From Swiss-Prot:
The keyword GTP-binding does not apply. It comes from Rickettsia typhi (strain ATCC VR-144 / Wilmington). SUPFAM superfamilies: HD-domain/PDEase-like. One of its GO terms (molecular function) is dGTPase activity. This is Deoxyguanosinetriphosphate triphosphohydrolase-like protein.
Length: 384
C-alpha cells in the first residue's frame, strides 16, 4: 500500500496531450514502457559510462547497463518506503537519455562548442528528447509522459533556482513543472540511486581495467576496512571476487543508510502528503551526514585516480577532438547533415543551426561518432 505522501498513479496530474488510460498498466508503468521503446534508450548501450566498450572490452558498463542498475536500486528503495516503485524506476531509466557520446567528456566538449548558444546540458537534453525529438506518434512530438515523470527527470537533482536552460524554460511555459520546488520523493530516490550505482560500479570497473589497484583503494579507509574483514574471513579470496564482495557490501550499506535516514526525516517532518515534500526546505530523501562524507570522499578519489588518470586524459583529448571536430565541420557545411536533420534548421540561421547540430551530435553513439569523424575529418581515429 502506498504511503500518503507517495506519488499515486491514480492521482497523476496527467499528460500534456490527454489519452485514454489502459486497464492493464498504471500511468507510470506506461511511461516506463514508452521510455524503454525509444530510440534514445536503445542507443545508451553504445554510449560510454567511463570506459569505451568497443575499445576497452565488452564487460565494462555503458550508459544502458548503468541506467538499469540505477533503476533496480531506485525500485528497491521506493518499495521499502511504500513509495511508487514504478515512478522511481521510470525516472531512473530516463535520467541519462540526454547523454552525449563519450560520457561526461563528450558533454563537456559539446557544451564548450555551444557556449555562444546557451550551452548544452544532458539533463535538459533528456527532457528535449522525451518531449520533442523522439518521433513515434502521429498526433504529437515526443512520447507524452506524465507530469510526474517529466518533473522527476528535470528536478531529480533538486529545485532549479538559478539560470534555467532555454529548452526547459520554453517547455515549462506550456507545462509548469514547478521548477522552484523539490521533486517527488521518488525522483529524489532516483537521484541518490544514481550516486550509489556510479560510485560503486566505477570502482569495480576501474579495478578490472587496472586503472587502480587494491593499494589505491586503501586510500579510502572504509573500503580498506572492507578488504581487511573479507581477507580475514576468506583467506584465499581471488582479486576478482574481492572487488565484487566490496561493491556488494558498499551498495548494501549505502541503501541501508539511505532508508534509515529518509525514514527519520519523514518522521521528524511529520510528512503526510506529497506537497509537503515538494515545499520542504531540504531534500527529504538523503543519507546520514557520515555517509554523505564517505560518498564525497569516494567521488574525489574517483576523480583523482580514475577520471583524471593519464590513460583517461589521453582518451578524453581524443574524444573531445572528435566531438568538437564534428561540430565545426557541420557548422561549416550543413549539407553534411542527414536531410531529416537539415530541414529542422531555421533558414540557415546560426543559432538554430548550432542547436540542431548539438541535438544531432548528442544523439550519436560512441561508435557512430568515431565513424563520422573518420569519414569527414582527418587524421582518422580507428581507435580511441
Amino acid at each position: 500500500m502506498l504511503a500518503s505522501y507517495a506519488s499515486d498513479p491514480l492521482k497523476s496530474r496527467g499528460r500534456l496531450y490527454k489519452e485514454i488510460p489502459t486497464y492493464y498498466r498504471n500511468e507510470f508503468e506506461r511511461d516506463r514502457d514508452r521510455i524503454i521503446h525509444t530510440n534514445a534508450f536503445r542507443r545508451l548501450q553504445y554510449k560510454t559510462q567511463v570506459f569505451i566498450n568497443h575499445e576497452e572490452g565488452d564487460h565494462y558498463r555503458n550508459r544502458l547497463t548503468h541506467s538499469l542498475e540505477v533503476a533496480t536500486v531506485a525500485r528497491s528503495v521506493a518499495n521499502t518506503l511504500n513509495l511508487s516503485s514504478d515512478l522511481a524506476e521510470t525516472i531512473a531509466l530516463a535520467h541519462d537519455l540526454g547523454h552525449t557520446p563519450f560520457g561526461h567528456v563528450g558533454e563537456k566538449a559539446l557544451n564548450e562548442c555551444m557556449k555562444e548558444y546557451n550551452g548544452f546540458s544532458h539533463n535538459s537534453q533528456s527532457l528535449k528528447i522525451l518531449t520533442l525529438l523522439e518521433k513515434r506518434y502521429a498526433a504529437y512530438n515526443g512520447v507524452n509522459l506524465t507530469w510526474e515523470v517529466l518533473e522527476g527527470i528535470v528536478k531529480h537533482n533538486g529545485p532549479i533556482l538559478g539560470a534555467i536552460n532555454e529548452y526547459v524554460a520554453e517547455y515549462n511555459k506550456q507545462n509548469d513543472l514547478e521548477l522552484n520546488t523539490y521533486a517527488s520523493a521518488e525522483a529524489q530516490i532516483a537521484s541518490l540511486a544514481d550516486d550509489i550505482s556510479y560510485i560503486s560500479h566505477d570502482l569495480e570497473d576501474s579495478i578490472i581495467a587496472k586503472i587502480i589497484d587494491f593499494n589505491n583503494l586503501a586510500e579510502l579507509q572504509y573500503i580498506d576496512n572492507y578488504v581487511f574483514k573479507l581477507k580475514s574471513k576468506f583467506k584465499d579470496i581471488s582479486p576478482s571476487c574481492l572487488i565484487y564482495e566490496i561493491v556488494r557490501k558498499l551498495i548494501h550499506e549505502l541503501i541501508t543508510d539511505l532508508l534509515l535516514q529518509t525514514k527519520e526525516n519523514l518522521k521528524k517532518e511529520k510528512i503526510t502528503n506529497i506537497n509537503e515534500i515538494r515545499n520542504l526546505h531540504y531534500q527529504i530523501v538523503d543519507f546520514t551526514e557520515k555517509t554523505n562524507e564517505r560518498i564525497n570522499e569516494t567521488k574525489k578519489f574517483l576523480h583523482k585516480r580514475v577520471y583524471e588518470s593519464n590513460k583517461m586524459i589521453a582518451i578524453s583529448i581524443k574524444c573531445t577532438k572528435i566531438v568538437q571536430g564534428l561540430f565545426k565541420i557541420y557548422m561549416d557545411d550543413i549539407n553534411l547533415l542527414p536531410t531529416n536533420w537539415k530541414i529542422l534548421i531555421d533558414s540557415n540561421e546560426t543559432y538554430s543551426k548550432a542547436r540542431v547540430i548539438a541535438d544531432y551530435i548528442a544523439g550519436m553513439t560512441d561508435r557512430f561518432a568515431i565513424q563520422e569523424y573518420n569519414q569527414l575529418c582527418a587524421p582518422k581515429f580507428n581507435k580511441i
